[in-house]
Amino acid sequence: STRIDLKLNKNNINNKVINSSISGDTTQQGLNRLNLVIKNNPDIVVLCLGGNDMLQVVNPNIIFKNLDIIVKELKEQNIIIILAGMLAPKEFGIFYKNSFDNIFPQLAKKYDVIFMPFLMEGIALKKKFLQNDSIHPNKEGVKIIANNLYPYIKKGVEALNNH
């Protein structure tokens, strides 16, 4: 969130950024904490959940259901949502991969939210941008994610200003 803060400030966008993410969170854990996020009265939420569910091979229907509830509740609060999608590696098998990969575009279409198709674009499977676990981004990877995410956040801020 610090990188996003700096980028927003550099572009004269002075919204406050609150990082409510917890490393390792699943969609169920995100759903359990949703009321805490809503209590902060955010104008915009960047929703980046689902990757940890995938790593635990959680049924895509459950992931969809959890994210669906989260997006629905955020929408009911008139919060602008930026949904960051994830993609399953082919090692998970074609059925799981297809089911998982379709969750995010389906939700984006259903709720008409700002949609970033793949949060890890440009860094997934590239060791130089990943921590030793080959999953999470390192500092350089985080920079790339922040740069990739920025246009979507800018779109969210513009939508907020047009409210």
Per-range role (PLM):
Residues 11-26:
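A short beta-strand-loop structural module common to alpha/beta enzyme folds
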Residues 3-6, 10-13, 29-163:
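Alpha-helical cap/lid subdomain in secreted, periplasmic
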